[in-house]
């Protein structure tokens, strides 16, 4: 029962991550060697010590090798110290003089905090001279045996001492206590010990997710602390007892330091069993700390082994090898070896954390109990710098473990939680052997992530830095599982297949696509794709992520393709579809619309590079269809605030099904995250019936046709009634009661279902408003500008444990900046007389002043206008737009209905490239053709980001003004069946107030 309580307690526990970047803050960068020229040359052994130390550092994966400066006199030392921050003084006393000691004393007198060590080749003469010197200024004395790695060991020993307190407090870093008074011996054993520990730290650094993290992770290696007498060892142990990885002790050493007591030199004899006294004390205090006794007196072996200590014979020719074997076996280095407690036979060998996770349920119970009850797993994790899991398990395993299976679950859950925590906010280097269902975000290649990739990484980091996202029981907040093919993969694909000549030609889009589909992606990525399919087990969105896309200053949102690939258990079929989708996204860089966009934004097409985001599609499967419960686009600026809303409170457009429905301009639900109970579209019954969602998008899971330039070829548009049959509307629908002429909150039998989101917005079924507010606030603060965020939610039918509604998942899919004009507008537009205005809108999008447009293009819409002509009008406008691009001119565009809608009955179905030269776009209502303000979509993101105004007017309802008669009276520069282009001699003045949502176009003076 107790173990189950522990497991339940663990399930609600959040691990605290370790910031390795904060460790090892104090380093030795500059070393002053005090020696006569001959002794310094001997140290360098006919070569440069800098070069040798540099080679030592690089071979062990270390950074920041120190620089060495050699001086012989006090004057030389003073000059170096005047110009350089010296971190360590190495004193090398010569065989014939004591000048080095004199210089060292002078340095220490002026700089008492600089560590000083003695490094000397031992001889009887030097030993006697040292005995007669005042050695109190020196931290350590070392015996030079000709090995350069002793210098490295000295530096690391002092760095460890400088960082010990901080790093233990910051991260729980472990330490190895070495107790030894023999200068010659510790000068020999320290280089071996450090080279082993540093090599092991390189090995455990592979637990990191990318090279940068691996380098930082090495800072979490165990530190080495040297004690030279019993009192010093006891002080160190008692101070750091909770962070001792293990102890290596000599047997015979002094009880106290050889310093003066009561003014006289104290006799400081060595005590033959000082090591036993020390180890017995430690063993009583903590029986789980591994203890190694090393002694030249073999008589101590039997006593040491009887007490449970490991013994290393100092006289052995392979003493250093024996010591390494004991370290690997008992200090947690190397592989973790599960053994049979009776026979000590190897049961299972574990190389890394993922292998422990994969095998924990297969370890025999007696073996698992043997190791957990002795703290072995916790120590192994500590040695690998996996401190959060180690510290938690250490508290569990000190108890009597009765329920071994519960303990397996605790270990498994701890590892899963840790891996999840470490994955969040980190772009890992993709490793097919380690990428699994608990992995998160990885990249293939070394190039750029592109716009969407960067945005996803940024969102992931926001979630990691703000733990309040995880405050809701049973609600997971995350980004979807993602792998990014970096831009260097694109370069390799284009170069190896010689595609640039075709891509940059004027070939039709479909022909460009066919050339790209026939090209080959490198086979080396196939195994990576298979690993990703296995880990996701869901449909995959293949999304463009270009260098220019979602730029802070030039938004390319929606210019390139996004394909969705349904999941199938046939991995080769899946591979074919995903690879074709990747090639199709690459091809979309060179489509006609993309080239037009590049021209409009003054970018060069062959400078664009494409990364590709492979991302699990958020959703749930319902028969042959797959879609999320809720998709949304969230903007931190609301250009259409109503009642007590403000522009700064933002706006969300929510819909049932895939988010492409919102991007395509479908009928979404506009919601203020700060006023979720006030939804304009639900304020009156007739509005709710007319202005809410009737269709939704879903991915068809059956194998469809081959890829085309239309990236929505396998997206089905379904009636909302279909979702009712799927059970998706339970918490997001209201029900129309035709008999009583009322719309009721909630899902009831019979009656038309209205997508109102009432369960999540008004009744607390799911904390969507809170999550929207957090996302908007943290995203805008992180980017330091207004943002647009795409999101999706899956709602479960399972009730949350806290009784607050249902469990669910909230995914952030993309973030990009809303680039607004910084131009000041210090005028009240209401004060401008109507007779000065060509256009006036009380519902405008955009901000700023423009005085360089002379042209107006408008649709010749009469009262009997038919929306059936809209596709034709779009083509006519495209032709005119091309003329403006060629002449590098802008224009004001006026037309009926909603611009850019994929449904031509709602408005003129233009793409951005067809109107890319427009500076103001006006949607004008007609008596028989009512228009409501459009939602924020990719299309309008581009308009507003480039300073283009967007006006909505309905003059027949006295909502805004359009002085069409002025234009009709002017001669046409160009005229088609449905569209006129007129030009003023002087520029029009365009003024937009983005806060008040007002805009005017003034006639020339």
Descriptions of predicted regions:
Residues 13, 42-45, 49, 65, ...:
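Conserved phosphotransfer microenvironments
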Residues 37-42, 74-76, 88-99, 123-125, ...:
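Short acidic, S/G/P-rich loop/turn micro-motifs used as interaction or catalytic elements
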Residues 100, 130-141, 305-312:
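As written
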Residues 119-121, 293-294, 314:
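Hydrophobic/aromatic residues positioned on beta-strands within the core alpha/beta folds
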Residues 431-471, 520-925, 942-945, 976, ...:
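Conserved mixed alpha/beta core segments that line enzyme active sites in large multi-domain catalysts
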